[in-house]
Design a protein with these regions (language model features):
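Beta-strand/loop-dominated core regions that host nucleotide or nucleotide-derived cofactor-binding catalytic loops
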Residues: 342-348, 352-375
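N-terminal amphipathic alpha-helix/helix-capping segment at the start of soluble metabolic enzymes
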Residues: 1-31, 130-132
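Catalytic alpha/beta core domains of metabolic enzymes, predominantly
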Residues: 141-144, 149-309, 320
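Glycine-rich phosphate-binding active-site loops on the catalytic face of alpha/beta enzymes
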Residues: 55, 98-115, 235-252, 340-353
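Active-site beta->alpha loop and helix N-cap motifs at the rims of alpha/beta catalytic domains
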Residues: 50, 54-168, 172-173, 189
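Glycine-enriched alpha-helix->loop->beta-strand junction motifs that scaffold or abut catalytic
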Residues: 76-79, 96-102, 130-132, 200-206, ...
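Hydrophobic faces of well-ordered beta-strands that scaffold small-molecule active sites
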Residues: 26-32, 55-59, 79-85, 102-104, ...
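Short, acidic/polar
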Residues: 37-48, 87-93, 225-229
Length: 378
């Protein structure tokens, strides 16, 4: 199921057998939560998500072993495949022949080959995409905005986010490549609204992928997603969407159903009143995906939600992140952050590390730190 919301007409971008933007209906995306090298499980989840209504299924790759797995996954699934390059943009060259779209994060390009300029790296990505007949997504994220843009716009992360996306669009076009879409994500739905409105006003021609990153557990995560999606889709902003929910593997398809339900409601003029999440405790958690380094992450997020229920009237943010990609940067702005590794959880207060604890030990310490913040009047 998909729906045409054509108040804003972007250019059409072909992704495999489907089109994004232009006159095409809005496409729902999702992301596999299985380990990419677990080929049978990943193929099964690709098919599960496709059957639920996902027009594009994304897989994370971290190294050449993952690329080898994607080659076999491609052979076994009919899903339209996108890959997330994470921190190693060079993997694009070896994975491109087997996928339909590649997502790169502008804020991660500086991690390797620091002697090369960002324009050189973007030019290489454009040539790889062109040579292999694949589309690109420029995926800008609140927790990993490129350092030079943060320095250029001190105190205004939102403007840094938007300007980074605009610059990368211009770079792509300077290299003669325009088969790309853009995403501007934040865990705060109001910031998602502002960022996407600013970008759409500046580049009405570029297709936009919408997402509230780390929306968290349902039902709160669905509500946060609705806050942004209803207002943006109703004005024609958004060509593809994803509801990024924290869910166990066997329920991963529920984020597809949630996104489809929002689309259906907007199409039929049904808008649901939503609460203001700025007035009380806000728990954000990243969507379960193949980057998660311990499957206990989802259970921990649920335990954090239950443990902190007593503090729901306090205006605090607690972030629960499942991997090293999202963990460091996207817990920095939270009052309390939990960055989950393979065997330990790093507990943080803003950008300061409190300590590393086992999954069993971290909850009592979280309660202690939360009580201290409440007592201090935060």
């Amino acid at each position: 199921m998909s729906h045409a919301l054509d108040e804003r007409r972007t250019r059409s971008v072909r992704v495999g057998r489907i089109n994004i933007g232009g006159a095409a209906p809005v496409v729902v995306q999702s992301m596999c939560a299985t380990k990419t090298r677990a080929i049978d499980a990943t193929v099964a989840q690709c098919e599960q998500l496709r059957a639920a209504g996902a027009g594009v299924v994304r897989i994370a790759i971290d190294n050449e072993k993952d690329v080898t797995a994607v080659k076999e996954i491609r052979r076994q699934t009919s899903a339209t495949l996108s890959v997330d390059l994470q921190e190693n943009y060079r993997l694009a060259g070896s994975v491109a022949p087997y996928v339909d779209k590649i997502r790169y994060n502008p804020g991660h390009l500086h991690h390797i080959e620091r002697e090369k300029s960002v324009p050189d790296k973007v030019g290489w990505l454009a040539s790889v995409a062109r040579d292999n007949d694949v589309a690109l997504r420029i995926g800008v994220n609140c927790g990993s905005v490129a350092p030079d843009f943060l320095a250029r716009y001190p105190g205004d992360q939102l403007e840094a986010l938007v300007e980074s996306a605009l610059w990368h669009c211009q770079l792509m076009e300077d290299f003669g490549f325009d088969r790309f879409v853009v995403s501007l994500k934040d865990s705060d739905p109001e910031k998602v609204l502002q960022a996407n409105r600013r970008f759409a006003a500046a580049r009405p021609d570029v297709p936009i992928h919408l997402g509230v990153t780390e929306a968290g557990l349902p039902p709160q995560g669905v509500i946060k997603t609705r806050i942004a999606f209803e207002k943006l889709l109703a004005t024609g902003i958004g060509d593809t969407i994803r509801a990024s929910l924290t869910l166990p593997n066997e329920r991963k398809h529920e984020e597809v159903l949630a996104a489809l339900a929002i689309l259906d409601d907007v199409r039929n003029g049904r808008f649901i009143s939503v609460p203001d999440f700025g007035q009380g405790l806000n728990i954000i958690s990243c969507p379960s995906c193949s980057r998660v380094e311990n499957d206990a992450f989802v259970q921990l997020a649920e335990q954090v939600r239950d443990l902190t229920d007593y503090a729901k009237q306090h205006r605090l943010t607690i972030a629960v992140m499942g991997c090293r990609v999202n963990g460091p940067g996207e817990t920095d702005d939270a009052d309390l952050g939990l960055w989950c590794g393979p065997s330990t959880v790093v507990l943080k207060k803003k950008d300061q590390k409190v300590g590393s604890f086992s999954y069993a030990e971290v909850l009592p310490r979280l309660r202690t730190e939360l009580d201290r913040l409440i007592a201090a009047g935060r």
